[in-house]
Every structure is written in structure tokens, then in C-alpha cells.
Amino acid sequence: MGDKAMPRAARLPSRTLVEGMDRAPARAMLKAVGFTDADLKRPLIGVANTWIEVMPCNAHLRRLAERVKAGVRAGGGTPIEFNTIAVSDGISMGTEGMKASLVSREVIADSIELVVRGHLFDGVVALSGCDKTIPGTVMALLRLDLPSLMLYGGSIDAGAFRGRPVTIQDVFEGVGACAAGRMSRRDLAELEDRACPGPGACGGQFTANTMAMAVEMLGLSPMGSASVPATDPFKDDVAFEAGRLVMALLRRNLRPRRIVTRDALENAVAAVAATGGSTNSVLHLLAIAREAEVPLAIDDFDRISRKTPLLADMKPWGRCVATDLYRAGGVGLIARRLLQARRLHARAMTVTGRTIGDEARRARETPHQAVVRPVAKPLQPTGGLVILHGTLAPDGCVVKMTGHEPMRFRGPARVFDSEEAAFRAIQRRRIARGDVIVVRYEGPRGGPGMREMLAVTAAIVGQGLGQSVALLTDGRFSGATHGLMAGHVAPEAASGGPLALVRDGDAITFDIKARRLDVALSRAELARRRERWRPPRPRYTHGVMAKYARFVSSASEGAVTGTPRHA
């Protein structure tokens, strides 16, 4: 890239860091780690990596980072790589460690922001893999508003067990099946060994793949990049081009807040609805919208989902995995279907310099693919996201509906004040058909950290109760969850929400058509119970968890921390 194509030096933040006599100490330290005078004359591009060797989702990101850096150099820039944290949802699931997961989203965003501000980088490429690294990196890019993009590491390949494809979802459900005597321990051990064959994020339309798709639809990842699997050799080429692309963004001065508009956010929500994506996307897109300073409310998800057909037949509730979607045509095919359904704001801009409509029209569909349905033959006429309100959820809660769940369910409450207590009851087979399992004090403040209930929900499914019980919680659900499950109930129990007042045996009704979640108690009875209710003692009194509990907002606002921008 020639000098004439670059922004004026005065517009590059890095010039303040490395130019002039008084910056000799800074240059000396940069030279100590291998940078040359020639390197420092070029734009400095931060490569924000979330590599970690504790999980497959991010284990290959060092390799991809090298290709990104090569692309930056080819485009005329100097890449500077740094790392931030990551917490594995899948590994920590069902333990106290899971409380760190959602908290890590805020730390990832904060840490990237601090490194980039502290070193005056001119642009950023963020590499993500697991669930919270995707929204965390995007939140940081929007705060910084430098020419930048996010590159997703890609999905894991499906495992193979007894002639059928499997994912980590099957292992979680195998635990429940084993406890119910429906699977032997030997078979579970074999499944454990075969479910995860290598690097990459969990292989269904779970949270990571849902959010990677959403970021492509937002326009902050190059169209076609996210669905390339982690082990596909083409992924290295994608990474190289991402490095080149950030230099083109710098040349055009195209920044994230010009890309992440209201239209772009609605495109992302529509894609989640059309693919039966993770309910975690509600939390994360609300948080992303806040960083972009774009109005987005929880009820917008329901409004968009009502008008969007469910088109993708994907796990956890369907047949196909993420690599199947790649072979069918990738995220571009989803965009194309939404364009055909008139559910796409086609003029929204993307990092490629093309509109999302242009990208949708360029998408190629593999002949005879069976992953993404034609618009005229949807799996169901409305999307997979449903927002309920009612006496138990005045500020809303989130349900994923994919056509297999009952539209109405009424049953007696079985109340548990922690995930562990609920899991023990299920494993000991103390839950009966028709019960409504209530797991509370697991919200953003109460947990703190709003744990995912996959261990609980998978145990329910594994024991054959997936269609005969319901569950509601102020915690979250994994993207691998399926069945009638209401999460993100707000206000949460720890804040005095109605969920805190429920007792064993209270009749709870889910009415999906009416968008209601109610408990059969009079206002007078709820008031009497509220008078006797006392908030529980904080589970953490110092450290990051206590700090998070103090500052985090409601799930209905994205469970974000920090001062609202309008304050």
C-alpha cells in the first residue's frame, strides 16, 4: 500500500507514540522486542488474540494470528500481537467456575480497550473463538471505533460415534442418560473420547457459531469468514485476507460505528431467529448495541422473530452441524434467504466495503443442500426467539422455540436456589413429568455471573423428560439447550424479582402464543410474601465477582457493567 493511499500522518494515533525526538525511549523499547525503524514508520495494527490452551475453541488461534500478521504486513502495516483472557463455558459448565464466564466478556472488552488505548494503535484485528470472546472483542472494537474487524476461529468438526455425527451436546445429554440407566458408563466414555476431534468451537448452532454468524451479519467480519471450519486449510487464507482487509479499512477510514447501525443489528437478530440460534445472542447483541450507542430493546427480538421464518435445520434441536452449513453455502446463504424473505436491510455496510445485500446476492448455494430451507418451505413460519412477560417476568425473559416445544405448559413449581441443587434432584430422579423446575439466584447479580444451565437441561433431556417438564431461571442457557426453557428472567431473584417469591407447588403457566409467563398467585399473596422476603447474603464479598455483582445491569439490558453513556 503506497503512502498516498494512507491517511495523513496526523490522523494516525501511533504517530504520537513513535515520532519525534522525545519518543526515543518508546522506540528504544519497541526495538528491544524486534521492531525496526522501518516497522515503526508504518501504521501500527493491534492483533488482539484470545488464544488459550485450555479449550479447543481457541487453541488454534496462534496459528491464525501469524497469518493475520502476514496479511497486515502485506497491506503495508506493522502488526503487534497481544493476548487477553478466555473462559471455557463447556469445561466450567455445572461448576462454580461457570460464574466467571459472562464476567469474562466484560474483562475481555476492558482489556482490549486498555491495551489499544495505552499503545495508540491505528487499527485492530480481533481473533475470537469461544462464546464470550466474540461479543467481548466486538464490544471493545466499538468502544475504540478504530478501523477494525473481528475474525472468528471457526467451528470444530463433528465427532463420530456409532456411525452418527456427535457434538459436545451429546456428551452432556449422555450424562443424564447414564444417570437414568439409558446409557452405560462404557458407552459414555467412548462418546467422551469421540465427540471433540480437534480445535474449533462447539459444533452446532450453539452460542459461538450463533454469535460469529451475527457478527458477519452486523458487517464486522468479512462475509464467508466465520463458517469456514477451524481445521480447513482455507482458514489460513481467510486470516491472511483479514490482515490485508484491516489496512483497506484504515485507508478508507471505515470504522465500526459506521457499520453497526440499527439496520445492521436488526439483520443480526433476524439471522439468529432464522437459524434457531442461541438465546445468549439476546444478551450479547444488547451489550453490543449499547457500545455502538444504538437503541435496541429486548422486545425488538420478539418483534423481529415474529416476522422471520425459521429456515436452518441445525443442532441443538435439528439435524445439522456448523460444518454442514459451511458446505451448504455458509452465512452468506442465510443472508440470501433473508433477502429473499424481505427480512434483510440490504443497504447496511460491511467491512468488505460492500453492502450486506451485495454479499447476499454473491452467496452460492450448494445444489441439493438440506441445511437451509427455501423461504417458501420454512421449518416454521416464525423465528426461534420468543420474549415472554408476565407476573414472573415483568421485564421479560427469553425462550427458544423451534417447533418441538409445547405452546402452552402449566405445572407445579419445583424450586431450587442454585444450579447444583437442581442438578442433584434431577440426577436422583426426583423430578416428575409435568413439573416446572425453577432455578433462581443465578442471575447476573445473584450468581453472580448468570451461569448457563446446560448440565441441568442436558440431564433433563438425557433422562427422557425434555418434552414433559419445563424450566425457568434468572440464569442463562447454553446454545446447546433445547426443550421448553425460559431464561434471563428479569428482574432477577437477587434483586427482589417475583421469581424470589415462588414456592414449591405454585402453579406456573407458560403461554407462548400470548407471550406470558405467570404464577397463579394473587397480588395480595405476592405482596405478603414480599414483606417476608429478605435478600440473600452476597456469595462473594471481594474480588472481581463482588465487583461485577455490584455494577452489573439486568439481563433485560444485556447484563453490562459500567456507567450508562447517557449518565
Residue positions per predicted region:
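A short, small-residue-rich loop immediately preceding and capping a beta-strand
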Residues: 116-137, 149-152
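Glycine-rich, highly charged phosphate/nucleotide-binding loops
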Residues: 101-110
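Catalytic or ion-coupling anion/metal-binding cores of large enzyme and transporter domains
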Residues: 2-57, 64-85, 90-91, 96-101, ...
